[in-house]
């Protein structure tokens, strides 16, 4: 038997007929399977015990030999060897075919290997194999060519003319004859000679043929083995047959396919023995060929063979390929022991690195550990009694369990695992009930909520696995997102709302302008109702535990609110006191304008100061990032827990609720609608007079309604109170956005119909007033589309991720420095005038390609091949430098991967990337993970031609597949100045560009939106109109690097 676990390497090759016979333990001659009365396998059939081994351990078929003592005896009555029944999983049989058949993989695969070796087209091969044409195998001294195809009629004519002077045949036999005659050495030499001269199509074909020839030579396989004389039969346990209740049998499809082969093969043998007419024999040979094809790969050629209920049968190939095949389903997707799953609920009192594990689950998962501990403590005499104790759930078991799980991390995983933060490690704490408790802050990383989500638990067993889980995978270690280095553990929902409410300021609140000696005094006053949480007050700066205040400031009063005093207690002491949501306050110090002399009249001072914005979600994220930068992981995770607790506590105390009275309708709404109706009336009149086209009318009507909706939205925002609960929820970033609010209180606006075209009848009502029946009906289109899109999008996005991982998985950091002298010049990414990604964000964490000097003082900002930190990036921007040459993975010289310097820093840890880091997979996940959130909709600006610019997920796929994009932009092939834009001779606008040595004109449709005007200076390959550039066109006009840069910029959008 094979030793499955111990091998050096694995090689897959063609099997020769002798090899197949050597695997086999006997020939299968009959199509019978199991006798339905005795339930014993039929002799010489597909389940024969003599060939494949006994059905029962140590027992022959007829029952003459039973027991282990007869091991290895071959029964003289039934011929079955006495051995374990497990051999039925590994013993193979074979079928001796009455005529050779072609293996469909080699004849039908792409490219057809058989066709390449014989230098024939797959079409011709098919005609020969399926007995439609003859092929000349030996031309003799006739004018025929070898491998020439002859029809039935031509064959008869030539037979009469030349008699026995030439040989021609059909079917796999003829092909086998030709394949046997091929001299690989000679063919290889001829092909190499041909490569010297050949061009174009002939050259590519020669290269492909040479590859196959070389492969045959090097592997020692014979081309004629692509034709089968013997068919292997796989072991019966792999294609089982079981009896169901009611006496019926369930069987694997393979048995049906094998039976068809055996039946046809036996019939062919009989016909050959009888000496039947050629036409009948040929037909039978063709049927045998088709039966073998169906067995190996059903449905590859012609209609698949179907079983009961018109279901295509699963052939050998189907068993292996695809998601449900052997590899992806069973070898890569095994079920694992020491795992469990349950519903998750929130655990607000957990620490960042903890999770709550239900007691019963922990007992089952840690069973072996508990049993060992029980025995070693002497609480149980042996493993068996320890097991009994656990099953009875004795009292001492729980104490041992507490001991065992201490410092033993478990892994929590939520499907779908879209990026590496979908599996993290936690220290378990035991909880009552049957639900897993999850820390609220890690929900963002898992994309989890508590509406019934389930999660799986896995126990790392070995010491190494535990160490790895603790050091690399602990939730407290994974604060930054690997895709952009920003914190992924940000407070959400209630936590955001609590901290927002805490840091609000109100005018003329109770106790405004009071002065306190320290935070304790202020808190006593607050508790007793002398001062409000939002009141602006003065506090002696010296009493605040903050190392950032200067000596001067410590003697002054700090103007702040009670809430901000509380908020600042969660931050580390050496962090600036945060009084306003600005970058300056976060990174450098509290602005001096908040300090006043102790002699100041605080009340009047405050009354003249504007209110400061409260801290919204974004600022909380920035605070976390800043704390992480200065204090690293441990301190950050403690601070996060404090922020979470404070947020929950305050949002509970604030008692923010939503009632119908909080939705205030707009007084001016009727007149805005009135105006819009008038405008639409005017546009329709213009259309009736023929002044504008139908398309233009539609566009303008939609424009009018969008403008009306925006006006209502803007007026709504202005009319809202700062303390309106719905406004606070939206403003803080806890939940909802302004358009939800507009739909509640303003108007719902325009809706799209199922095809995605916008219906020009707007929904003028809002949810507060209620919709009319027609409006409700129009709304249902959009809702339905939303649901179907989500379902389709998830599958698409997952498939995109899978393809990305497939191409990027070999990209690993291989060395420290590849020593390249090339780099990539980068500048801020812009879309029109708007900056999508500023230069400093692109620079931070990369290595400089050239030494960068200050343009005025000429001092060195950063040396070449040094890391550009955030501070250096700010200096570069401050010096007014707009483009910088950096080391980039595009220009890295490392073979099979990238080097440290070209990659830059590891965003997930904020430190230098280490050799061996699988950066390709991180990149693939970072693109694939947000794919689920991208929209599927192709936005239509009213369905005008040339304006369907694809966005979202389809656009990303378009870029990676390098397809011809939808809504393609016209690009210029010359560099120069745009001299004129005028109406062309035929439809459209003509743009003329004067280059250095020539002049070119491009015609674009009228509806295209132009990106250039007369006098614009253009580079080669720049777009003249809005839209996506075809990368293949760009590479013709410019170099590879510019295409890489264009694709990079597009993906970043």
Swiss-Prot record:
Transmembrane segments: none annotated. Its EC number is 2.7.7.6. Binds 1 Mg(2+) ion per subunit. Zn(2+) 2 binds at residues 818, 892, 899, 902. The keyword Transcription applies. The keyword Acyltransferase does not apply. It catalyses: RNA(n) + a ribonucleoside 5'-triphosphate = RNA(n+1) + diphosphate. Mg(2+) binds at residues 449, 451, 453. Signal peptide: none annotated. Zn(2+) 1 binds at residues 60, 62, 75, 78. GO terms for molecular function: DNA binding; DNA-directed RNA polymerase activity; metal ion binding. Keywords: DNA-directed RNA polymerase, Magnesium, Metal-binding, Nucleotidyltransferase, Transcription, Transferase, Zinc. Its cofactor is Mg(2+); Zn(2+). It is an enzyme of class 2 (transferase). GO terms for biological process: DNA-templated transcription. GO terms for cellular component: DNA-directed RNA polymerase complex. Belongs to the RNA polymerase beta' chain family. NCBIfam families: rpoC_TIGR. This is DNA-directed RNA polymerase subunit beta'. The gene is rpoC.
């Amino acid at each position: 038997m094979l030793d499955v676990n111990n091998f050096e390497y694995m090689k897959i090759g063609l099997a020769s007929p002798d090899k197949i016979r050597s695997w086999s333990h006997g020939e299968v001659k009959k199509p019978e399977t199991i006798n339905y009365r005795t339930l014993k396998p039929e002799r010489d059939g597909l389940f024969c015990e003599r060939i494949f081994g006994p059905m029962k351990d140590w027992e022959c078929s007829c029952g003459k030999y039973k027991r282990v003592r007869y091991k290895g005896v071959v029964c003289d009555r039934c011929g079955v060897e006495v051995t374990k029944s497990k051999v039925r999983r590994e013993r193979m049989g074979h079928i001796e075919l009455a005529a050779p058949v072609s293996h469909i993989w080699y004849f039908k695969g792409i490219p057809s290997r058989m066709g390449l070796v014989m230098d024939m087209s797959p079409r011709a091969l098919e005609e020969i194999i399926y007995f439609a044409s003859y092929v000349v195998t030996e031309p003799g001294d006739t004018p025929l060519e070898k491998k020439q195809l002859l029809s039935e009629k031509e064959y008869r004519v030539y037979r009469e003319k030349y008699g026995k002077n030439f040989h021609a045949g059909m079917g796999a036999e003829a092909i086998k004859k030709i394949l046997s005659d091929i001299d690989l050495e000679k063919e290889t030499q001829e092909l190499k000679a041909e490569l010297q001269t050949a061009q174009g199509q002939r050259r590519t074909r020669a290269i492909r043929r040479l590859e196959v020839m070389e492969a045959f030579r090097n592997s020692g396989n014979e081309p004629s083995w692509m034709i089968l004389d013997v068919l292997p039969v796989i072991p019966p346990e792999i294609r089982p047959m079981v009896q169901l209740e009611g006496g019926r049998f369930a069987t694997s499809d393979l048995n049906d396919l094998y039976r068809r082969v055996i039946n046809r093969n036996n019939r062919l043998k009989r016909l050959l023995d009888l000496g039947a007419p050629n036409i009948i024999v040929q037909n039978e040979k063709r049927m045998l060929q088709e039966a073998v094809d169906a067995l190996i790969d059903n449905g590859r050629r012609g209609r698949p063979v179907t079983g009961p209920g018109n279901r295509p049968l699963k052939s050998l190939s189907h068993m292996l390929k695809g998601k449900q095949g052997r590899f992806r389903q069973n070898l890569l997707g095994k079920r694992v022991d020491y795992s469990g799953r349950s519903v998750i609920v929130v655990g607000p009192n957990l620490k960042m690195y903890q999770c709550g594990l239900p007691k019963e689950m922990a007992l089952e998962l840690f069973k072996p550990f508990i049993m060992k501990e029980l025995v070693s403590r002497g609480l149980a005499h042996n493993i068996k009694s320890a097991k009994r104790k656990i099953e009875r759930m004795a009292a001492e078991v729980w104490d041992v369990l507490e001991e065992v799980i201490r410092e033993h991390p478990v892994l929590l995983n939520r499907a779908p695992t879209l990026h590496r933060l979908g599996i993290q490690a936690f220290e378990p704490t035991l909880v009552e009930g049957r639900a897993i408790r999850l820390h609220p802050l890690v929900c963002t990383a898992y994309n989890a909520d508590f509406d019934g989500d389930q999660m799986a638990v896995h126990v790392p067993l070995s010491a190494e696995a535990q160490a790895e889980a603790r050091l690399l995978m602990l939730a407290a270690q994974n604060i930054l997102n690997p895709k952009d280095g920003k914190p992924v553990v940000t407070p959400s929902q209630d936590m955001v709302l609590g901290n927002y409410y805490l840091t609000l300021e109100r005018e003329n609140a109770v106790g405004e302008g009071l002065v306190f000696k320290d935070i304790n005094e202020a808190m006593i006053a607050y508790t007793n109702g002398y001062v409000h949480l939002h009141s602006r007050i003065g506090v002696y700066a010296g009493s605040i535990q903050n190392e950032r205040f200067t000596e001067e400031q410590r003697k002054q009063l700090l103007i702040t609110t009670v809430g901000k005093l509380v908020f600042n207690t969660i931050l580390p002491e050496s962090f600036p006191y945060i009084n306003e949501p600005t970058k300056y306050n976060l990174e450098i110090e509290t602005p001096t304008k908040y300090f006043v002399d102790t002699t100041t009249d605080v009340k009047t001072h405050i009354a003249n100061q504007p209110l400061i914005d409260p801290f919204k979600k974004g600022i909380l994220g920035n605070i976390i990032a800043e704390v992480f930068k200065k204090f690293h992981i441990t301190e950050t995770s403690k601070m996060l827990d404090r922020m979470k607790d404070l947020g929950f506590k305050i949002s509970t105390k604030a008692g923010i609720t939503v009632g119908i009275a909080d939705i205030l309708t707009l007084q001016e709404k009727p007149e805005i609608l009135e105006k819009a109706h008038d405008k639409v009336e005017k546009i329709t009149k213009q259309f009736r007079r023929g002044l504008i086209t139908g398309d233009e009318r539609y566009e303008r009507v939609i424009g009018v309604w969008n403008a009306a909706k925006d006006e209502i939205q803007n007026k709504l925002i202005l009319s809202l109170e700062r303390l309106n609960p719905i406004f606070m929820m939206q403003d803080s970033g806890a939940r909802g956005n302004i358009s939800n609010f507009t739909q509640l209180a303003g108007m719902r606006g325009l809706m799209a119909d199922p095809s995605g075209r916008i219906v020009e009848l707007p929904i003028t009502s809002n949810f507060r007033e209620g919709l009319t029946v027609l409006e409700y009906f129009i709304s249902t289109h959009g809702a339905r589309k939303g649901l179907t899109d989500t379902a389709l999008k998830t599958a698409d996005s997952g498939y995109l991720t899978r393809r990305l991982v497939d191409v990027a998985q070999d990209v690993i950091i291989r060395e420290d420095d590849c020593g390249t002298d090339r780099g990539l010049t980068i500048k801020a990414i812009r879309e029109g005038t708007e900056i999508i990604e500023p230069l400093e964000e692109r620079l931070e964490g990369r290595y400089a390609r050239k030494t960068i000097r200050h343009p005025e003082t000429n001092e060195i900002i950063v040396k070449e091949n040094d890391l550009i930190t955030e501070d250096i990036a700010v200096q570069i921007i401050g010096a007014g430098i707009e483009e910088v040459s950096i080391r980039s993975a595009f220009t890295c010289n490392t073979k099979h991967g990238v080097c440290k310097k070209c990659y830059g820093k590891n965003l997930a840890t904020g430190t230098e990337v280490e050799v061996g880091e699988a950066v390709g997979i991180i990149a693939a996940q970072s693109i694939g993970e947000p794919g689920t959130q991208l929209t599927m909709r192709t936005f239509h600006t009213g369905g005008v031609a040339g304006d369907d610019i694809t966005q979202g997920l389809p656009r990303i796929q378009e870029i990676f597949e390098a397809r011809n994009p939808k809504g393609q932009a016209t690009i210029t092939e010359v560099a120069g100045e745009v001299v004129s834009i005028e109406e062309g001779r035929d439809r459209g606008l003509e743009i003329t560009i004067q280059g250095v040595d020539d002049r070119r004109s491009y015609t674009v449709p009228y509806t295209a939106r132009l990106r250039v005007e007369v006098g614009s200076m253009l580079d080669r390959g720049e777009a003249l109109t809005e839209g996506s550039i075809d990368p293949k066109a760009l590479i013709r006009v410019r170099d590879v690097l510019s295409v890489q840069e264009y694709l990079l910029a597009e993906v970043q959008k």
